Amino acid sequence: VGVPRTVYIAGAGIAGLTLALALAKFGLHVVVLERNASASEFGAGLQISANARKVLDNLGLSEAVAEKSFTPEGIDIFPDGREKPLQTLTLGKTIETRFGAPYAVMHRADLLEALHAAARRFANIDIVFSVTDFALESSGSALTVKALEPDGKTRKAKPFAFVGADGVRSVTRTRYLGGPEARYTGEVAWRALVAPETLSGMLDLSRTSLLLNSRFHMVVYPLPHRNAVNLALFTQEKERDLPVLDQRAPRIKPGKDRRLAHILDSVDEGWTPWVLSSVQTPNWHRDAIGLIGDAAHAMLPFQAQGAAMSIEDAAVLAPLLAASPSAEHAFSRFAALRQERVKRVQEVSASNGKIFHMGFPFSLARNAVIRSEGPEGHFKRLDWLYGYDAIQSGKS
């Protein structure tokens, strides 16, 4: 038996740790470089659809995810301050039966902790925290990695491959692959957690709620094991205002919308703004260096698929890096398998944002379509998304 291949990964986020686990299961040695002092994740809620859940289950995380997540029975859609839902989309057991895994919501930090705990159980995964910088030298299959560790020492290695899972502001993409800087989308996500009792009588907390308005939209869902409800409010903001976002609350006037006014009043701890940027680049790899997740294809969250695409990426790339004759061959095959799908998800996400924010009279047509599709119409429309098998794709 030869020496196992070594793969270096930049970033101990959801993309990086999922890939580390997937590679470790194939027997590869994995080193994860993380600039933070611990595995940490910004944000609050996270939606895990069936296409991502199947990957996590395959990595042995079924129990950990089930323990910390919640499965909504459906999605209540409230356009323009309606008292009752225009439509309730079916989720729950129906979606699990159709796609082979449930649709769940959970706190991002809980998923990251589950991934980190699983990674710690593998002797062939090393996670190096507080890495201040790294340098790559690449020519063909020859690759040298130098990582500056917190004690001032430099870790030097010649791995089989280097994967940038270093997020929307990826150094791997911009410094080593000639990729673009992330582009501001014009949208900001404002996140908050509130106590469930503050929304009593306002929303059905057995379901997710989607509030639509021409100036914003809001997604609300419970995180029961944290005794909290996740609020994600999306507004359009001018780029010149971004530096002062954290000094103010979102500028939303509820008007006659009693429900919205109550939700806004329930936020005691304040809102945390998150500027939404996107990445579109055809350059996912060069030689033995490649990208996954937001580093390659950050997208608007309006189909709730950013994390899911990162998780899919890991499932597809791992077997390719394990079996391909060269890292370049693995990355090339990975791009061929993933780029078209990811582009489609990016386009659907952007389109959803426009649909959510439609003003009168276009909102009338939107509402008519939502009503006519019925509670299960979204299944057929999204079969291609939720029914995808990333594990099988990586074997092709």
Question: What is the predicted function of each stretch?
Answer:
Residues V1-R5, E67, E83, A261, ...:
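C-terminal helical "tail/cap" subdomain of flavin- and related membrane-associated enzymes
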Residues A39-S40, V171-T172, A298-L300:
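Catalytic P-loop NTPase motifs of RecA-like helicase/translocase cores
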Residues E137-S138, P222-P224:
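Short, low-complexity Ser/Thr-rich regulatory SLiMs
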Residues M202, S214-F216, P224-R226, L233-Q303, ...:
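FAD/FMN-dependent oxidoreductases across multiple families
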